[in-house]
Structures are given as structure tokens and as C-alpha cells.
């Protein structure tokens, strides 16, 4: 499965992986992370705003990713997996740390992508900090950025995350 797969292919792949680990006759409540910018309208609803990390999967932007997953699960005859929550990975990291330390105020991911969540008052905010773009670029950064799917977007992520670092070095 590559990053240009259709939305159906992507969620069918995820559903197939889930099918491999579940037991028929048992009921599963599923909490899942989605590591892309989304608008959350309910604990189990997340509408993809736009792809990052060079994903090009069609027919997903603007869609409820949990509903797409349920459709894929049902297509495979899987009715015993019930998605009950979807969360951004930085928020999940924040909550995991805060579970044992109530002084935590930041959750951060620097892996394939880059993002940060922070606590302001009683609310955890997903900052989508990988999209921070007011940073100085050298000529190599500028050359590399022009080779990406979305130039001038996700600059901090492009200059710091694992998805891009090898390619940055290769183009220098």
C-alpha cells in the first residue's frame, strides 16, 4: 500500500490488519490515533482537514475517518469492533504522560512527522506545530521544499521529522 492509495484501499488495509488480531465472538472497543490535522466534532468523530507527510490518498479530506474505518470493517464482515474514540497522537502522548504526572503541559511527537499539543487552562490544544513556517531557510532547505508535494507548508516538519531528513540530506 503506498501513499497514493484510495481512501477505501487505506481503510480496507487497516481493517484487514485489525481482522488479523481479533477473535470472532468477542466485542472490542477501539480507541485509535490519527496523526494528521483533523477537526474533532465528537470523541469518535474526526474529519481530516488535509494530508501531510506527502500523503496523497484521495477521497479522505473532509471525511470522518472513523466512519471510513467502520465502513471498511463492515465490508470485511467485522461487526464486533466498535470505534469509541479517535485522538491525535500528540494529545495521546500528552495524556499518557499526564496520567502519572499532573504537571505535564506539553505532549510532543518527532517521528515520521512533527507536532505538539499543550495544555491551556483545562483544554488540550493540538498545535499542528509541524506547519510552523516562519523559520529561516538556507538554500538547501528552499531547494528541498520545492521538491515536496506542498511547498511552503509544513516547513518545521520538513526540516525536523524522520519522513524528510533522509531526502534533505540526499538533495544536499
Q: What do these predicted ranges mean?
A:
Residues 11-27:
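Short amphipathic alpha-helices and their capping/turn segments at secondary-structure boundaries
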Residues 26-28, 80, 88, 110-112:
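Short, basic and Ser/Thr-rich N-terminal targeting/leader segments
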Amino acid at each position: 500500500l503506498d501513499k497514493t492509495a484510495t481512501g477505501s484501499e487505506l481503510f480496507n488495509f487497516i481493517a484487514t490488519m485489525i481482522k488479523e488480531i481479533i477473535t470472532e465472538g468477542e466485542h472490542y472497543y477501539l480507541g485509535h490515533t490519527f496523526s494528521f490535522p483533523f477537526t474533532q466534532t465528537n470523541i469518535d468523530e474526526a474529519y481530516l482537514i488535509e494530508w501531510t507527510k506527502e500523503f496523497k490518498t484521495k477521497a479522505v479530506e473532509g471525511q470522518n475517518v472513523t466512519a471510513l474505518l467502520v465502513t471498511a470493517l463492515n465490508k470485511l464482515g467485522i461487526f464486533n469492533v466498535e470505534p469509541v474514540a479517535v485522538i491525535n497522537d500528540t494529545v495521546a502522548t500528552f495524556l499518557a504522560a499526564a496520567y502519572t504526572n499532573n504537571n505535564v503541559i506539553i505532549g510532543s511527537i518527532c517521528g515520521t512527522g512533527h507536532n505538539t499539543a499543550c495544555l491551556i487552562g483545562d483544554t488540550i490544544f493540538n498545535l499542528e506545530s509541524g506547519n510552523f513556517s516562519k523559520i529561516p531557510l538556507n538554500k538547501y532547505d528552499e531547494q528541498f521544499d520545492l521538491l515536496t508535494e506542498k511547498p511552503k507548508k509544513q516547513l518545521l516538519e520538513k526540516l525536523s521529522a524522520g519522513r524528510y531528513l533522509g531526502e534533505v540530506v540526499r538533495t544536499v
